Amino acid sequence: MFQHTTVLLKEAVDGLHIKPDGIYVDCTLGGGGHSEYLLSQLSEDGRLFAFDQDDMAIEYAKKRLARYEKQVTFIRRNFRFLAEELTARGVHRVDGILFDLGVSSPQLDTPERGFSYHHDAPLDMRMNREQSLTAYDIVNHWPYEELVHIFFHYGEEKFSKQVARKIEEVRKEKRIETTGQLVDIIKEAIPAPARRSGGHPAKRIFQAIRIAVNDELQAFKEAITQAIDLLKSGGRISVITFHSLEDRICKVAFKEASQGPQLPPGLPLIPDQYRPALKIITKKPIVPSEEEIEHNHRARSAKLRIAEKL
């Protein structure tokens, strides 16, 4: 069962100012929580396009959202193909777009998917199970320098070199096949005082490998640019992030689109192509309430940013 507690449900969807007959996109369908709440506010003329590259998520959501089948279109593809997929369906402008980034609870809680450092499972971590690159390939075949790069930049791990060196040592002797083996290697590589603070010692390394396997940051950069372009005037975009790397991409994209390019001073009229594209609605990101965090500890690091197309 693809059970998943939706984070910042009302805040993210209500922030889109839903029009009953509008066209909306949920770029991260997951368990279907945001989509269900959004669909409940649409009339028969409203439309929702829901993206997910995980076949498990699509199958579950089709059942959950069966009563809205005339209003929802499921698209099993990475959201980096947002514009391409909508254009293919004759959609060139939309009223609202939602991103809820990060791994869904069912992916984390299904041991054989290999996302979690709490279960021993094959090193996989693919959100799209048809792609070839897995966590096993990265851990066993990527060179030391590449491992250091992803651990430091995607995991913000200060012991990146030590972990990469330990992986290199171990894989010379035997293949590293499971998440459990990798956790043991990470624990050996990180100094004892550091292991005792700051959460699970494998958290940052697992995040880094997952981001690399799924090319998450580049995919999001491409998708958010397309999303801003696709919005109608007055349309809104809600983005929920779970770590600083994603949040930075969102913050920069919103800031750049809300400022417009630098212009020479003294222009009597600003040409349309130089006007800002967005107005930022959330000066500071919206974060979950203490009550929400108490009910769903995975919501703790969530941040919601909203912007409106001018």
Swiss-Prot record:
GO MF terms, alphabetically ordered: rRNA (cytosine-N4-)-methyltransferase activity
Example GO biological process: rRNA base methylation
Function (record text): Specifically methylates the N4 position of cytidine in position 1402 (C1402) of 16S rRNA.
Gene3D superfamilies per UniProt: Putative methyltransferase TM0872, insert domain, Vaccinia Virus protein VP39
Compartments where located: Cytoplasm
Protein known as: Ribosomal RNA small subunit methyltransferase H
Keyword Cytoplasm: yes
Lineage: Bacteria, Bacillati, Bacillota, Bacilli, Bacillales
